[in-house]
């Protein structure tokens, strides 16, 4: 499978420091959005991406890619938690992480937080991940509607993030790329951080990685 990839990140208009990190290193692609403010968020996202790259960035057997990716995310979680525990300036830091490893015919996903992975197919953009936020949980439980979720004051509160819990729960998925190739001239998988509280689309404020086959 031939891959084309690109990445960009912008601090935006509201923050002074860019707390996002990414990796575009075939077969590994990932985005991370740091939490904790000041130095912490930037350190957490960079550490998570660096650990992920070290543990899952090399080519390996197809049948072991999902296991390697899962283990790498858990290793990244431990690395962020350990750094925060050993440096009082970084107390409370954490990060989201949405990553994929490309195999021969499949793409393996791992996800924690509210960064997002999308599948772009025949012009349709489909969300592949679920936001781990308090507001999304409230939405699923019927406590609020989608319009209320977009402006809810707690829409930035995460229910899962790397570095916060020693045994983080990782969402996983598989995209069968061979099926996409049969139907598409230019199939793409996109990973991005969409502004929190904007559940509908990958817009201009998103940091994104797109992978085409």
State what each model feature region is.
Residues 205-212:
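Short, intrinsically disordered C-terminal tails of secreted or membrane-associated proteins
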Residues 1-193, 200-204:
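PP2C/PPM-type serine/threonine phosphatase catalytic domain
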């Amino acid at each position: 499978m031939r891959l084309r990839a690109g990445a960009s990140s912008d601090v935006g208009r509201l923050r002074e420091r860019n707390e996002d990190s990414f990796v575009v290193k075939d077969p590994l692609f990932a985005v991370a959005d740091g939490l904790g403010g000041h130095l912490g968020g930037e350190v957490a996202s960079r550490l998570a991406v660096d650990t992920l790259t070290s543990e899952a960035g090399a080519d390996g057997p197809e049948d072991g890619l999902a296991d390697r990716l899962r283990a790498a995310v858990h290793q990244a979680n431990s690395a962020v938690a350990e750094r925060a525990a050993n440096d009082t300036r970084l107390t409370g830091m954490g990060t989201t992480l949405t990553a994929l490893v490309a195999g021969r015919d499949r793409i393996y996903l791992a996800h924690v937080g509210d960064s997002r992975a999308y599948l772009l197919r025949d012009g349709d953009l489909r969300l592949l991940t679920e936001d781990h936020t308090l507001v999304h949980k409230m939405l699923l439980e019927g406590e609020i509607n989608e319009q209320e979720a977009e402006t809810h004051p707690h829409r930035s509160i995460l229910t899962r993030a790397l570095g916060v819990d020693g045994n983080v729960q990782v969402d996983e998925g598989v995209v069968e790329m061979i099926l996409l190739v049969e139907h598409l001239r230019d199939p793409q998988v996109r990973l991005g951080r969409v502004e929190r509280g904007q559940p509908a689309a990958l817009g201009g404020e998103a940091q994104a990685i797109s992978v085409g086959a």
